[in-house]
């Protein structure tokens, strides 16, 4: 599932842990997600993680003023679908962020309106495999005329916590 439910489960070797962080500064919100592996990473962990990272980087490369939220969603979703995990990308690609954590515009197949210069959005593709685990990588991005600027500075390589 994209968002965990509290439980008494203890982390086990090979668990993915999705960590969604938020911040509030002078009335403006920030949002960031990173995923780590507990213990040892398998080739499957690396495969899933790298697909999600490739999807997010494709979205960051494509995002700019004038494209629609639907187009940006499709760019990220295509990477995951082409890798064979389209059915496991079960949420929208992102959302606007600012005075609220989740605000307009939605980065989803349903938003046919163009992104405007100086919007701040999240780009957060993910893969979630029932009974196994999931990965999401999320950054806040400032939309400019011909590009977007990621605002988060946290590394994106897969971290393994031993």
Stretch-by-stretch model annotation:
Residues 1-162:
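Active-site neighborhoods and metal-handling regions in enzymes and metal-associated proteins
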